[in-house]
Amino acid sequence: MAEEGSVRRRAGLIATDSSESRWVFQDEDDSDAEDQEDLHPQMSFDSEEEENAEQRLIRTGPRIDSFDVEALEVHGAQRNDDDDFTIGRKIVLAFQTLGVVYGDVGTSPLYTFSVMFNKSPIHGEEDVLGALSLVLYTLILISLIKYILVVLWANDDGEGGTFALYSLICRHANVSLLPNQQPSDARISSFRLKVPSPELERSLKIKEKLESSLTLKKLLLMLVLLGTSMVIANGVVTPAMSVMSAVGGLKVGIPGIKQDQVVMISVAFLIILFSVQKFGTSKVGLAVGPALFIWFCSLGGIGVYNLIKYGRSVFRAFNPVYIYYFFKRNSTHAWLSLGGCLLCATGSEAMFADLCYFSVRSVQLTFVFLVLPCLLLGYLGQAAYLMENLTVSDQVFFYSIPSGAFWPVFFIATIAALIASRAMTTATFSCIKQSTALGCFPRLKIIHTSRKLMGQIYIPVINWFLLVSCVVLVCSFSSINEIGNAYGITELGVMMTTTILLPIVMLLIWQINIIIVLSFLVFFLGLELTFYSSVLWSVGDGSWVILVFGAILFLIMYIWNYGSKLKYETEVKQKMSMDLLRELGCNLGTIRAPGIGLLYNELVQGTPAIFGHFLTTLPAIHSMIIFVCIKYVPVPVVPQSERFLFRRVCPKSYHIFRCIARYGYKDVRKENHQTFEQLLIESLGKFIRREAQERSLETDGDDDMESEDEASSSRVLVAPNGSVYSLNVPLLADFNCSDRTFSEVGTSTEVRPVHVSDLSVSDTEQSLEWELSFIRKAKESGVVYLLGHGDIRARKDSWFIKKLVINYFYAFLRKNCRRGIANLSVPHTNLMQVSMTYMV
């Protein structure tokens, strides 16, 4: 018992040892299944598997670190160090980092002062110093301290963004509203969390509170969906703002050009931008990296030029007292200018969302030693120019450029604006993919643009949707001042979401002192709420459009999550009883035809109700049935060796298995159906061999234990689903399995159950080889994909809002989303579908 207890404790804590004791493929003992399901009707089948696995675990020996497993088996996985990169590779990654991560924040000098002084006109030098001081400290506090020094460390195995934070919390506390998370998911190597301290006592109360409170779970999900909707809205505003501010420089170089012409040129650039998006980051990364490097050097150089020409008195702005003077002199106008001031930190959230496969340390060093100094010099130079030209308040950046360098800088600025827009679009794609993987966004076609590096994706529907939205926004507003206010709304929405989620990570995972956490929350949330009050005051100027846009996106995601949750819970309640399968016998009340049937469903436990419809509809069923559930777990990558989790649904003579194919939200699913079938069959063979090996070890160890385990292996899971299921059709065949012997695939004869205690070692090996041969023959006969298309409808007595949401909105989304099987490219000749409607 002591040994068993120690195994349980090791399984319950976060693994830090390189050697483990666990099975990934195993046959579970279901002796306690009925009792467990009575106590926990919504738990997955692996709740029993976890306990039995712990009783049977053996030490597997030294095992390579889980993150190294990801890197070895899946190209592009995040590594925790840069030691394996050559100097040349580091230089390449540094340039790509500039192009991917810093494009948005790097173009903020194009419009920050212009938008600020549109709200608060310049009346004297102190106004310039006050505005500059606001910009400097906003950049230092939000971009540097909050994001670069703190938020970047909250990445999920290298993945950043709102949903990465949510995924990190879900892995440490069961707060997901979709009840399909299994204890076995915690045994995925990349599921393990790294925390500063091995002691979890301080975070235990928070974890229990989050897991026990349905209200907190809903609030957390709504907060994440709200932040995600703002990220997508940001994907619309950023290209419009960046491109228009860059093209607007033409009004300085060509005084006669009109605003309508600027708008049309901006639209043309936007069309080009979104047209090349499909080529991926890696294909243009080497080009945009050097371009951004030249841009930052130009920005710093222009700043130094202006400081030398107009004086260095602007360095006084590092004294925060000028912020006080600024508000004292301008009061309301200074407060309204806060919305424009925030634009200097736009792109801070994109730095986190675009973290991707770059290391945190490299991003931090690049920002501190290149990006931040160039930005500070750029703003100081513009302020120095304004000190001598108080009447200039529009297009400040382009007016501050030396006349001889205007057109080269204009060209570089336009390129930088396009790169910044592209980076935000890429972040939007990544965010949508993460939300789709966690069941919060309708499935869409996702194209992976790189074979070597993961995370580089392209979503055609979203790409063209963003293009149309950007064009409409540019044509409707036609001014960077109005777009700038909308930009501030979306950026602050994402920032505040991160500010609220990060303290949960700090307390739950990092286990930081609560005083430090509360100080972080109060300071940054208070700061961002102050900025938010400023941008909301000007919402009547047209910025309300972006709020409506974000609200529509939020409703789409919430309705999809709500409908998916109802559908899953209904399928769990109406699943087939195992007693019924026992009564039907080994032939399932019909004829077993040669071949393998892969029945896709969303259940992680139990027999799906749609299987009964196949039995009643089809004259025969395949000799081998595998219930396949493609399940996304909240980790970036699931190693290929841990992709499939198998168990038997019935005794061996039934030839029915359950397979859960687990994918992370960064996993690349580009395999064709032949590759998927091959991987699945190989994994099934490994499962059967390990099962036989386990039985053999038990037989050699203790005859009494052997008999008990063998007896329990024939017992099956009986789940109290609360529904009565009947085929209501005459049985096509009714065979008594106990009176049959082994026969060929496709015949109506079956297997007589044989206990392990009655078999010699050679008989056991013969039984194993026979079953493997059975699988090979079934595979040669063909694999058919059995798809149950389940729809949900609200009951007639449901309240009106529920009928509207389920019968119309959710039905519309489900009808137009991409089917999950489409990723496998299954030919129609291998496909069989049955529809079923659930009343909820």
Regions found by a protein language model. Give the residues of each.
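The structured alpha-helical core of multi-pass membrane proteins
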Residues: 2-840
